[in-house]
Amino acid sequence: MAINNENELEYKLIKKNKNPKISNSKKKNSTRPALQDKTNQTLPIHQNQAFSNILPSDFSIIKTPETKTADDFPVNGYEGLNILKFDLELFYKLKPVATSTPKSCMRTGSNLFLNETVKHVPDERLVSNIKNTQTKDSITRDSAYYHRKTMTESIIKTLAAFDAEVDEIILF
């Protein structure tokens, strides 16, 4: 019978404490051991010898860079680079004339491009607001399309040094 009483006691203790080896009396009187201080730190961090390298003994003043004004920069933006290095003579050869479509193009309509009898349509007729000042002998070479193409190429060549994508360049 003694065995049954011990088993009953253990069962009751397990129900109460969930740990049969620690009784209520031991649990109340036992104190938890202090956590071990692995750094051996007894002073504040800035006075502790174990952490002497955290903060420098002398604080150096960090100077912020001065703000540059417009006078500090060179005229062309950056030294050695001239961003607006385009051939401006192309603009002087082209003169704006009108903002509407020429009447000759309106009369023929889209059949103008499908008609086999038309050998060559000057580019200046298709560009409504640009008139070419060159002679008619050199109209194919010096047309508005030719100037726009060379202007586009010069813009792309100029901006190629900046690794700009073609989609980002606004073409006129």
From Swiss-Prot:
Record GO cellular component, one term: nucleus
Biased composition (Polar residues): 31-43
Role this protein plays: Plays an important role in chromosome segregation during meiosis I by allowing meiotic rec8 to establish cohesion at the centromeric central core and thereby promote the side-by-side structure of kinetochores at meiosis I. Enables monopolar attachment during meiosis I. Required to facilitate kinetochore mono-orientation during meiosis I, when kinetochores on sister chromosomes face the same direction and are thus captured and pulled by spindle fibers from the same pole. Acts in collaboration with plo1.
Sequence segments annotated as region (Disordered): 15-43
Keyword Cell cycle: yes
Organism, scientific name: Schizosaccharomyces pombe (strain 972 / ATCC 24843)
MF (Gene Ontology): kinetochore adaptor activity
Motif (POLO box domain (PBD)-binding): 100-102
A Gene Ontology BP annotation from the UniProt entry: meiotic chromosome segregation
Protein keywords: Cell cycle, Cell division, Centromere, Chromosome, Chromosome partition, Kinetochore, Meiosis, Nucleus
The keyword Ubl conjugation is assigned to this record: no
Protein name: Monopolar attachment protein 1
Locations listed in the record: Nucleus; Chromosome, Centromere; Chromosome, Centromere, Kinetochore
Assembly mode: Interacts with rec8, Interacts with plo1.
Amino acid composition bias (Basic residues), ranges on this chain: 15-30
